[in-house]
């Protein structure tokens, strides 16, 4: 798959890939204010505890922490942890809601990207990993590193 030169990753949620098995991914727009956009472009956002909920036929992103913009006045700055509306098609919202309600899955943001001037969230439909799964993944990564080291030394 070719890398699109118009897409730039602003914030990445590496922890989500460690704690969850990602089954599907979606791209969604986010409803943001001006100071939030400036802060995200500066890389001052945290996706660590963020998740999506579905209410009244809409998708909302909770616990996405976007730090207040430094040079904006205190009056016009945003609340760092407010709920943000996700912009998805109706059929995508219905599909995601069905997956979350029936199978016990959750929707977590994987990264925020800048796509042709618009900030988008890459969402993942995820199932939580157990502790032994996490340990297994760590062991596999270590063996891969050792194999690569051995091949590199030859």
Swiss-Prot record:
Source organism superkingdom: Bacteria
Main location: cytoplasm
InterPro entries, per database record: SmpB, SsrA-bd_prot, SsrA-bd_prot_CS
Annotated compartments: Cytoplasm
GO biological process entries: trans-translation
Entry-linked Pfam families: SmpB (PF01668)
GO MF term list: RNA binding
Keywords in alphabetical order: Cytoplasm, RNA-binding
Record region (Disordered): 134-154
PROSITE patterns the record matches: SSRP
Gene3D superfamilies: 2.40.280.10
A single GO cellular-component term on record: cytosol
Function text: Required for rescue of stalled ribosomes mediated by trans-translation. Binds to transfer-messenger RNA (tmRNA), required for stable association of tmRNA with ribosomes. tmRNA and SmpB together mimic tRNA shape, replacing the anticodon stem-loop with SmpB. tmRNA is encoded by the ssrA gene; the 2 termini fold to resemble tRNA(Ala) and it encodes a 'tag peptide', a short internal open reading frame. During trans-translation Ala-aminoacylated tmRNA acts like a tRNA, entering the A-site of stalled ribosomes, displacing the stalled mRNA.
Family to which this protein belongs: Belongs to the SmpB family.
Name of the molecule in the record: SsrA-binding protein
Natural source organism: Synechococcus sp. (strain JA-2-3B'a(2-13)) (Cyanobacteria bacterium Yellowstone B-Prime)
Lineage start: Bacteria, Bacillati, Cyanobacteriota, Cyanophyceae, Synechococcales
Gene: smpB
């Amino acid at each position: 798959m070719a890398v699109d030169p118009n897409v730039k990753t602003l914030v990445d949620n590496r922890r989500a890939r460690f704690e969850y098995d990602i089954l599907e991914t979606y791209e969604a727009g986010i409803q943001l204010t001006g100071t939030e956009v400036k802060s995200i472009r500066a890389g001052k956002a945290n996706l660590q505890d963020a998740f999506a909920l579905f209410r009244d036929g809409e998708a909302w992103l909770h616990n996405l922490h976007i730090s207040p913009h430094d040079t904006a006045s205190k009056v016009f700055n945003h609340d760092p942890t407010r709920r943000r509306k996700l912009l998805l098609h109706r059929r995508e919202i219905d599909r995601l809601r069905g997956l979350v309600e029936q199978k016990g899955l959750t929707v977590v943001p994987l990264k925020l990207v800048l796509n042709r001037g618009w900030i988008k969230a890459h969402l993942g439909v995820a199932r939580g990993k157990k502790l032994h799964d996490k340990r297994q993944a760590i062991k596999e990564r270590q063996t891969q590193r050792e194999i690569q080291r051995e091949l590199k030394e030859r």
